């Protein structure tokens, strides 16, 4: 099985509803999975999340903490903010970013270029990093895969930030 990173844009009101009643988020996922025509509120970045996280933070696995600044890239996929920490939506619980955190992260990633990311791309070091997902022998061609999904991520965050939306992330 592969661990696929999924992102879902939601309104501030939906965020508050899911925090108050986590089962509503499970219902949302059921509807999302049953729909054959997902709209632009849903993004699947496949297995690129580990490599993207490495390029952004220098770490194979980073997660947020309450002490992090609002725009910390450590929390881009794993904010450690849960509707219900015991709710398993695939590979663990869903994490969420508040609209303020989304805006802060957007400001940090919006101007990153291919050259910026390429400067942090070290296939040899990435291949040796045991916690980096997926575990593979990274090479120069793999950068294109990461950059393709990073561009989709940039656009997704830009839309969410411009609309004052929250983002939910989860592995399936």
Model-derived regions: residue spans:
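A hydrophobic membrane-anchoring alpha-helix module
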Residues: 159-160, 165-166
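A short glycine-rich, hydrophobically flanked beta-strand micro-motif that places a catalytic Asp/Glu
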Residues: 169
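Acidic (Asp/Glu-rich) sequence patches and key acidic residues
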Residues: 1-148, 152-155, 159
């Amino acid at each position: 099985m592969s661990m696929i990173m999924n992102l879902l844009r939601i309104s501030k009101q939906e965020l508050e509803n899911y925090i108050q009643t986590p089962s509503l988020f499970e219902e949302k996922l059921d509807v999302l999975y049953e729909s054959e025509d997902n709209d632009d509120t849903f993004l699947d970045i496949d297995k690129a999340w580990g490599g993207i996280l490495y390029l952004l933070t220098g770490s194979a696995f980073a997660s947020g903490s309450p002490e992090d600044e609002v725009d910390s890239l450590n929390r881009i996929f794993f904010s450690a903010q849960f509707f219900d920490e015991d709710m398993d939506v695939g590979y663990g619980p869903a994490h969420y970013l508040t609209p303020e955190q989304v805006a802060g992260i957007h400001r940090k990633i919006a101007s990153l270029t291919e050259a910026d990311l390429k400067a942090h791309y070290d296939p040899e070091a990435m291949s040796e990093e045991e916690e980096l997902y997926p575990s593979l022998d990274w090479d120069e061609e793999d950068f294109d895969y990461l950059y393709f999904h990073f561009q989709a991520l940039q656009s997704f965050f830009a839309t969410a930030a411009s609309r004052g939306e929250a983002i939910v992330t989860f592995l399936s």
